[in-house]
Every structure is written in C-alpha cells, then in structure tokens.
A protein has these predicted regions:
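A noncatalytic interaction/capping subdomain that flanks phosphate/NTP-handling catalytic cores
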Residues: 1-146
Length: 148
C-alpha cells in the first residue's frame, strides 16, 4: 500500500492506494500540498483507494441525483449511516464509487475508466470528502469556478 499525505488550509488528509505504487500522477494539481507525513491529530480525512474498495449499490436509501454540469453525483445512504456516492462525468459514465462514514473522516473509493477518468473521479471524490470532513472544523471549501 502506498500513502500520500496532503495539507490544505492547515489541515491534512491522507490517501492510501492499495493497487498503485505511486499515484502522484493522478493528482498533479495537488503537488503544492504534498507533505511527507501527518500525525493522526493533523488528519481530518483518510481515504483508501483501490480496485475493489467500493461498488455502488442502488439498494440503499436514495438521497438524490445532482447534475453539476461537468459531473453527476448519485447519492444514497445505507442503514449504517454511511454515504455512497457514484461520481460520473457529464455523459454519466462512472468515474468513481465513494463510500464515506457519516462525517466523511473515513472513506473508500474505487476508480473506473482510463487515466483521465480516474483523475476526474479521484479529484471529485477528494473534493467532496474534504468539504464534508472539514465542515465540522469551520472550513468552507470554495470551488475555483465561483471565484472568477
């Protein structure tokens, strides 16, 4: 398993890859935020990323479909309070299946498609998980598209 740690807005998160020895090529825009390691106290979110970490099942309580223009999210919640999110591109081709506990501090993700789709899926999964896990710390994630 390879681990990448990042520090954004003075808080950290860790990605653990079960099948990729060095996944930095999937996250070029995160390069300025890479740190060598984080303590558990510094980390607000941990995500395990692997080929068989998560599947998306429609058997859970449906929360909603969200069309965000270039991305589409299908969200459900299971009986344990965990969220399951299928992240797709604008053509509704799956890029990532994400499962998160209630506060998004622990996540698992499986990526789909070619390298471009995997970058898209992982980037969106990190953005969603970071936004929800950081909320309880008073951190607001603002997408670059709203600052123009």
């Amino acid at each position: 398993m390879s681990t990448l740690s990042f520090c954004v807005a003075d808080v950290g998160f860790t990605l653990n890859f079960t099948d990729i020895p060095d996944a930095r090529y999937l996250l070029p825009s995160y390069a300025p935020f890479f740190v060598k390691s984080l303590s558990n106290d510094e980390r607000i979110m941990n995500m395990i990323v692997g080929n068989d970490c998560e599947t998306y099942s429609s058997e859970n309580e449906f929360v909603g479909d969200f069309d965000c223009g270039d991305s589409f999210y299908t969200i459900s919640k299971d009986s344990n309070g965990e969220y399951k999110i299928l992240i797709s591109n604008s053509q509704r081709e799956p890029a990532c299946a994400l499962r998160a506990n209630a506060d998004f501090s622990k996540c698992k993700a499986t990526l789909f498609g070619d390298e471009s789709m995997q970058r898209f899926g992982l980037g969106n999964a990190i953005m969603v998980a970071f936004a929800f896990s950081a909320a309880k710390y008073g951190i607001l994630l603002m997408h670059a598209s709203v600052t123009e």
